[in-house]
Amino acid sequence: MAKKTRRVVKRKKKIAVDHGVVHIKSSYNNTIITLTDPDGKVITWGSGGTAGFQGTRKGTPYAAQLAADQVAKEAVKLGIKKVDILVKGPGSGREAAIRTFQAAGLEIGTIKDVTPIPFNGCRPKKKRV
């Protein structure tokens, strides 16, 4: 007779943080929003895909708004009151996500644009005609 295997279920640890950092990475194809504690440990995250969108619609501001709403609700549920926002990338979901965090009742400390800009790094691709 085959041996029965037991599944081990890991329980989430209780997080006692009242201040968080929201990382918004917005590309042309998707927007990924991650909520971390000040040390950088991930608390929760969401994206256009987890909000239920597929394909090109993941890159829309509405998809970013719904993803930010999911993350903001989880943050409020965990007792986070104040957030700092770090925005990276050129996508269309940046402003929509920031507005959603304001509307959710979270106090916003700072908003920083941390988009990487090269100091004359790699040669860019040739222009399309």
From Swiss-Prot:
The keyword RNA-binding applies. Pfam families: Ribosomal_S11. One of its GO terms (cellular component) is ribonucleoprotein complex. InterPro entries: Ribosomal_uS11, Ribosomal_uS11_bac-type, Ribosomal_uS11_CS, Ribosomal_uS11_sf. NCBIfam families: PRK05309.1, uS11_bact. This is Small ribosomal subunit protein uS11. Keywords: Ribonucleoprotein, Ribosomal protein, RNA-binding, rRNA-binding. It comes from Thermosipho melanesiensis (strain DSM 12029 / CIP 104789 / BI429). GO terms for biological process: translation. Located on the platform of the 30S subunit, it bridges several disparate RNA helices of the 16S rRNA. Forms part of the Shine-Dalgarno cleft in the 70S ribosome. Part of the 30S ribosomal subunit. Interacts with proteins S7 and S18. Binds to IF-3. Belongs to the universal ribosomal protein uS11 family. HAMAP family: Ribosomal_uS11 (MF_01310). SUPFAM superfamilies: Translational machinery components. The keyword Disulfide bond does not apply. One of its GO terms (molecular function) is rRNA binding.
